[in-house]
Amino acid sequence: MKSTNRSTVAISLFLLLSRSPSLFFSSLLPFSSSTMPTRFQKVLAHGTTMLDVVYTNESREVSFFLEQLKEKWLDAAMDHEKFLGLDLEYTADQRGVAVIQLCFTRHVLIFQWASSDKHFPELMDFLRSGITFATVDIRNDKLKMRYSFRIEIPTGCLIDIQTVFRLRHVRTSMAHMVVALIDEEYGDM
């Protein structure tokens, strides 16, 4: 790996997973009905990092994940590691939120918002709580969160990885960032 910063690697892996259907989503997306089962999976990322992934549309699983996140993982982390990866995926017409993804070190929540009952006060409170989130190109996600959830994440609580790692292009794609920051092998995906 080109970067040894564990937090950078975790966020980069999260972003890679969130944008690369060939890696992960194609194996999960067959469950699109409102009765889809919650799935807990271990996913090997980059050959050496095992991720614990929860894929669900159930409020109790989201609540449990957030509780674990706050009480076990986030509180135990060093201050410079207290941020989460955040990404939204959209419906085919780009008008609605389909999936909300959160990642912290090796823990990933993939919450299928589109097939849920859309009543998750714990999740909305968590997103508003002042935790720092890292993402790539937050512009569209901020708009969707504002209009879909009435959530405004303060500017000081957002890290846009594109502005942290100034690469060759002003708005470098996530794929180019992963190749430059993690490993050139990702260029073939």
Residue map of PLM features:
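A short alpha/beta connector and helix-capping loop motif
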Residues: D93-H107
